[in-house]
Amino acid sequence: DHVAGRKYGLECYSPVEDNGVFSDDVQFFGGEFIFKANATINEKLKALNLLLKNENLAHSYPHCWRCKKPVIYRATPQWFISMDKMGLREKSLEQINTVQWIPSWGRERIYSMIENRPDWCLSRQRSWGVPIPVFHCTKCSEIYVTRESVDKIHQLFTKHSSDIWFEKDARFLMPEGAQCSGCGSTEFKKDHNILDIWFDSGISHAAVLEERGNLSRPADMYLEGSDQHRGWFHSSLLTAVGRTGNAPYKAVLTHGFVVDENGRKMSKSVGNVVAPDSIIKQYGADVLRLWAASADYKAGISISDNIIRQLSDAYRRIRNTCRFMLGNFDDFNVMTDMRQINQMSELDRFILHRLHRVVGICLSAYEKYEFHTIYHALHNFCVVDLSSFYLDIIKDRLYTSPAGAPGRRDAQTVMFII
């Protein structure tokens, strides 16, 4: 109704007071609670012979998430950040293309959100939060906010915290000699709205990157769950572009959320929750770390006892491979016993070639934040190339050759390089 009214230039009509009753200018029903008035309105329409039909329909209706009571939407004065008057939308869309989005579909997601979003409603009606530092003339309702008034609030907040806004009246909070530009009055009242919490988090780049000497703008990366394209990534982009003209980050990485082995959300009522403490107690912290590193975080990340058991076996194979190599260095002096690669056998040079390939895969994966690729490359190298092939072949050299034999030193050098 509101959108249709705006389209045809109709006045924004909001006849409901803050306490949920019709305002006095509503004929017949002024002062009556809106939901109790439904029956009265039906009776009045019937009495005026204007009620064509009355029936119940099952439909979706907004309810309070906390108390489950029905709610209504009211048109009330709010503070907004315009997306178009100063070109914020266009500039933000341009800056999106300067950022590395990981995974790449994140770019399309946030681009579509910024492209189609309405103006940002900045104000909230809550009991406590970060106040909007604005004053209103009590005589003509003119808004009062100046550089001097903002500086005064900044000084008070620095000394007393934002609680001072709620504890003191407007006279204490305003600079001396403040006058209304509309009527010249010196009587003001505070604005009672607080800032949207997404504005609070959205300016963290200014609070952190500009206040800490060892940091600089923009941040190398913002990392959060995929829901933050609508949240932190979104608000940070708008506040940074609005203030500096540039995105606050070089890259944005988003991850999915932990689900069970069937892809279902973790829930105590379903009984599919896997607690980290129980994994650490049974398998050790390294297995939990390996699970995190092995998962492709771009989508939902599955976890279950069966998955952890498989990762535990993989961890044991990697660890045992390393233990075998470390166990053969007792008589090996790096300073005196290292061998030249060009003096080694084809087998030794081959495994070093395989190592070089694996290192290349891992370095490339690190650059792309594809940690699961690193796990798979490392696991395959340990199990296939080393344990089942190279280490199995060189056991004779290690166990039967004299301590200083060239072949034995070649094998030790290769293992040391690995």
Task: Please place each PLM-identified region on the residue numbering.
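Residue patterns forming the tRNA-binding/recognition surfaces of aminoacyl-tRNA synthetases
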Residues: 1-151, 168-169, 232, 264, ...
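Alpha-helical recognition segments enriched in aromatics with Gly/Pro capping
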Residues: 8-20, 126-128, 147-300
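Acidic, turn-prone loop/beta-hairpin segments
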Residues: 188, 332-360, 391-418
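Short, contiguous acidic/charged loop-to-helix segments that flank catalytic cores in large enzymes
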Residues: 210-213, 221-228, 309, 403-414
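Short, amphipathic alpha-helical segments that act as regulatory/interfacial helices
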Residues: 237, 315, 319-326
